[in-house]
C-alpha cells in the first residue's frame, strides 16, 4: 500500500483541499513517486526548506537551516509509494539526533522520484508546533467560524456529506452534542 502521512501539529484549510488530496493519492499510485507540498513562509528556519536551481527546479531540502536558501517550506503532508517503508528503515539520525522526514524526501529527490506541488494563496497551512503558532491557528479558525457562522472540519458533517452515514445517524450524533457550541 502507498502511504500518506500528516504531522499531528499541522492544520490545512482551503477550498479544494479534498481534491488536492485525491489528486495526490492518484499521482503517487500512477507515478510511483513521492509527493510533497511547498508553501511560502516568512520564517523558514523552523522548517524543511526547499532550494532551487537556476531553472526553479527543486535542488535540495534542508531541515531547519540557520541560513535558509529560500522561503519555501515543505509542509507536514507527505504522500509516498510503498517503497518508503524500506527507505525509512535505513534512515540514520541527523546531526540533531533525530530521524528526519527530510532525509526520506531527499532520497526521493536524489533519485528523481519526488514531485513538489506548491500550495497557492487559496490554501492556508498552519504549523502549531510552538505556543505562539498554536494561538495564531486558534485565532485563525475562530475568525473563520465567527465570520461564516459555520464550524470548520466537523467530522460528522463531513462523513454525512460523503454518504458514510445517513440523516438519522447524523441526527443521533448531533443529539449528543446539542448542549455544546460545537
Show where each model-derived region lies.
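Short flexible/disordered coil segments
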Residues: 16-17, 69-77, 177-182
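Conserved beta-loop-beta/alpha segment of the NTase-like Rossmann-fold superfamily
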Residues: 1-54, 79-82, 87-91
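Short, solvent-exposed polar/charged micro-motifs at secondary-structure junctions
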Residues: 45-49, 125-129, 162
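Catalytic-core segments of class I nucleotidyltransferases/pyrophosphorylases
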Residues: 4, 25-26, 57-157, 168-169
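Short, amphipathic C-terminal "tail helix"
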Residues: 165, 169-182
Amino acid at each position: 500500500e502507498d502511504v500518506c502521512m500528516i504531522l499531528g501539529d499541522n492544520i490545512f484549510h482551503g477550498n479544494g483541499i479534498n481534491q488536492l488530496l485525491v489528486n495526490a493519492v492518484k499521482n503517487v499510485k500512477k507515478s510511483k513517486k513521492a509527493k510533497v507540498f511547498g508553501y511560502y513562509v516568512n520564517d523558514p528556519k523552523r522548517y524543511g526548506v526547499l532550494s532551487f536551481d537556476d531553472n526553479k527546479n527543486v535542488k535540495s531540502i534542508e531541515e531547519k537551516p540557520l541560513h535558509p536558501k529560500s522561503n519555501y517550506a515543505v509542509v507536514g503532508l507527505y504522500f509516498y509509494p510503498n517503497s518508503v517503508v524500506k527507505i525509512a528503515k535505513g534512515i540514520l539520525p541527523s546531526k540533531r539526533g533525530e530521524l528526519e522526514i527530510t532525509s526520506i524526501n531527499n532520497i526521493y529527490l536524489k533519485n528523481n522520484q519526488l514531485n513538489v506541488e506548491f500550495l497557492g494563496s487559496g490554501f492556508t497551512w498552519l504549523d502549531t508546533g510552538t505556543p505562539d503558532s498554536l494561538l495564531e491557528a486558534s485565532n485563525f479558525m475562530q475568525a473563520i467560524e465567527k465570520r461564516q457562522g459555520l464550524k470548520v472540519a466537523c467530522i460528522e458533517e463531513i462523513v454525512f456529506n460523503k454518504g458514510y452515514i445517513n440523516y438519522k445517524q447524523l441526527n443521533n450524533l448531533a443529539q449528543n452534542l446539542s448542549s455544546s457550541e460545537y
